[in-house]
């Protein structure tokens, strides 16, 4: 006999966004780790994040989108409990995503960097490391 335990959905507790010189960073504050996938779409330009078994706690309507490649952010539920977040874009970008482990100040996070397509890697200023 086996027992199937329900998997608890992860909550996206908050979404923060800010502009850097060469990219826009979006950080999703999470209640737990998530399983996600990214999809880029053309005509019109969009970036889609599908998050398995997750729910969005706060609305995405108050993000500071001025001076970013993002024109609008929207979300919806797919297949019962999967969350889809869509970034409608004004320009082509190069996305990079990575999870961030909890630390003493924050919990689980997902970082999403949207690099400006017109800036080449060689043009990105080097960051000086201070130990």
Locations of the language-model features?
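C-terminal segment of classical bacterial N-terminal signal peptides
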Residues: 1-7
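Signal-peptide-cleaved, periplasmic/extracellular N-terminal interaction regions immediately downstream
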Residues: 7-131
């Amino acid at each position: 006999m086996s027992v199937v335990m329900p998997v608890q959905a992860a909550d996206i507790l908050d979404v923060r966004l800010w502009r850097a010189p060469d990219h826009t960073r979006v950080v999703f504050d999470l209640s737990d780790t998530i399983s996600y996938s990214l999809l880029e779409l053309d005509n019109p330009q969009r970036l889609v994040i599908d998050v398995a078994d997750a729910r969005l706690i706060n609305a995405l309507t108050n993000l500071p989108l001025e001076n970013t490649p993002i024109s609008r952010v929207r979300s919806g539920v797919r297949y019962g409990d999967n969350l889809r977040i869509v970034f409608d874009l004004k320009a082509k970008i190069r996305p990079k995503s990575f999870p961030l482990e909890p630390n003493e100040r924050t919990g689980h996070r997902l970082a999403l960097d949207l690099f400006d397509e017109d800036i080449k890697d060689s043009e990105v200023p080097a960051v000086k490391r201070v130990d």
